[in-house]
């Protein structure tokens, strides 16, 4: 099954991601140094760094999708339990609902189908939920698995406990969704602001040829441009870390 804490590029996907990073890095370095060789060499490393950074983004997005889908999954389990199904059959019923809802295009449907198959091999629900919690690294799934395992061992009112847990997780995810919506708008603003410095340099080079020549092809100019590039990259990283903070 999927390890949600890691991501493996396909050769084609990696090539496309690397090329995207290479182009951005090469253009940026050429604008700052007016040197094709520096642009190409720097672009190669920029492509590698971008692929690593983008992998973290893909992992984060996949976990977010699973988290939102999990909300629907446990809601289905709760409904099935209220209808009188056993916990094992509740997963089967929830998987059927998920199949209709997502048409086979969701992570949680595959996870519930896997749980259903493993239950047929006499594995326990507790064991399978614990396994999913470890593979996903998602707090809500870990919380649900912990509550479920405790309730099963202590013989508590499973339906009431799961309903309460589902309600808490739903409320928490709604808050996360609202925050995510606000952060998305700020991320767009950040991307636009990140484009301003290189676009200004490009504009000056096109509209006023020779205006930036004192900053190119000499040691003093290279040091100044390197300092400006360092400040630009540092500001970009600080902004990215602030907006990428876990909610």
What function would you assign to each model-found segment?
Residues 137-194:
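Membrane-associated alpha-helical segments
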Residues 32, 81, 119-120, 152, ...:
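Hydrophobic residues in alpha-helical segments
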Residues 1-75, 173-181, 185-247:
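Hydrophobic alpha-helical signal-anchor/transmembrane segments
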Residues 84, 122, 155-156, 221, ...:
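Glycine-centered flexibility sites
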Residues 42-134, 139-151, 157-159, 163:
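Juxtamembrane/interface alpha-helical elements of multi-pass membrane proteins
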